[in-house]
């Protein structure tokens, strides 16, 4: 997304200029401003360029685990994870810091043994007593940025894990570790659905799945395009110079 935004604005730091730049997020305030006519004026690169942004598709950012592994068995037994539980899983913030940000950690991780290590068994005594490991896109990715906004609410940092702009690297990390969890676009999950499970997500940002009144919804073409896969359905943009 950063490359698409930069190249359509002829920002040489992002690569060769292009007439059409794809993005999986909206424009940042630091990149462009929207005028009264709905067009965006570039703030970096060639600032004389104006760009028209078009929604061309919808994508469901898919949270995935190794099919049949410990993480899959845990999450399947829970019926999915809430958005709040995803935040707890991926955040480097302590439980105390997350509580101060409005999360009910006793609902999110009711079996937490307070050892400072986030384990699947913290979510339920029926889950494996194994540390949760992470695999997710790098910070230059629009997918990373969308997850940071939709799930992390732009608070704190991600916990350490395997980070890569290459989804193949993430798939290898996920399938090589039954305790790993990660995320990327739905199309890439579809390519690997024989070896990965896309989990159901409840759009509750304060409590765990057991206490969330919102239904957990798994990504599919119908739930993504129909708007029920929230908060992880997102528009895909084409920006035309």
Label each residue range with its predicted role.
Residues 1-241:
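Flexible loop/hinge segments at secondary-structure junctions
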